[in-house]
Amino acid sequence: MRNAITCCEYKVDLQFLIMTLLSPVDLCRLGATSSYWRAMVRDPLLWRYFLVRDMPKWPSINHVTMPRLEALHTPLCVGEKEMEEPGHDFMTDYLKGYPACRQQWFPQRPPYSVVTSFLQSLVPTATEPRYAMFGPGMEQLDVSMVTKLMHTPDVLPVAGIPQRQINGIGSGISYVYKNQHKFNILTLYSTNRAERERARMEQQSVSNKLFIQEGRDQSGHPHFSPTPQVQEVCQAVDGFIYVANAEPGRGDDGEVEWAQIQALVDPALGSSSRPLLVLSCVSREEPDQIRTTSSNSTRTPCVDMAQRLCLPMLPNPWMVQDTVAESLSGVLDGISWLLGCSGLRL
């Protein structure tokens, strides 16, 4: 309290400089000390600065916590007179997305839902949730995330191959999440292995045989429809996993990626409540010396990935999770969110 009172004696620009050096938690504590500081710490310019500075470092983002990026380019206040009408609430945007604070923004389940979920967890289910996994990050990276998944039992043990078959696709592979829940992943590759490997070595795109391109829509965007076999998969699964290439300069055309995602989550093929997990993947961990000394990150930030894939336009719940293929870092966090969206009690 004494320090907070002392800071009031500083010039306003110096007060703002000091606030930029505080953590969001410390700022909120400062705001609780007096009405003066409560007003000061809500300054939109301060929180817009924090958003621009910190968003690229966030390891995940989802449909609840995604900031309105277009607001970063709008005036801080509306009206002829200064502060006549406040503009966008950047403080709320920041605290919703900040990893240490975001949990409180998720909708709370009513008490009866918690009891129902607990009772359901006591009864073994006949089928495990199934997810379709696809995307260029499975095929373009130097390290295969799919191969790592199958051979890293300390992260996700393989539970086996179920009997339920889908013609031309197979039955997928079942995994066990933290010795609690089984789930099944159906892997959808764009083409055969030889063509994928050649395209990876030459860093070229391949003709995606999962989709049929049907020209362009009225807005000029490409329009795709899944092949009949892939449509059968979309109707059978409980959600989707899109593996995106997060290595800068190596991602596919965002417009095409968005159109293909939109084709698979089409409400005509299943409920729009089914979740989409985007694993924003790079081959290897970023070395500490590069991470701390270079301003150029070796991965696309997850907020930028969500924007590139136009995820805020989807009716489905979605999440982007930073992932590393070599160590599978981030995979468990993404799977936890996915299973939770499917109604499993974790």
Kindly label every feature range from the protein language model.
Residues 1-126, 132:
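Skp1-binding F-box subdomain of Cullin-RING ligase substrate receptors
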Residues 4-5, 24, 115-121, 169-173, ...:
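Eukaryotic intrinsically disordered and solvent-exposed regulatory patches
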Residues 24, 35-37, 45, 136-140, ...:
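Conserved beta-strand elements of beta-rich interaction domains across eukaryotes
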Residues 118-159:
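Glycine-rich phosphate-binding P-loop
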Residues 142, 193-202, 219-222, 249-260:
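Active-site-adjacent loop/helix micro-motif of nuclease/hydrolase catalytic cores
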Residues 150-200:
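Switch I (effector-binding) loop of TRAFAC-class P-loop GTPase G-domains
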Residues 200-248:
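Inter-motif core of Ras-like GTPase G domains
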Residues 236-346:
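Conserved GTP-binding G-domain of TRAFAC-class P-loop NTPases and closely related GTPase folds
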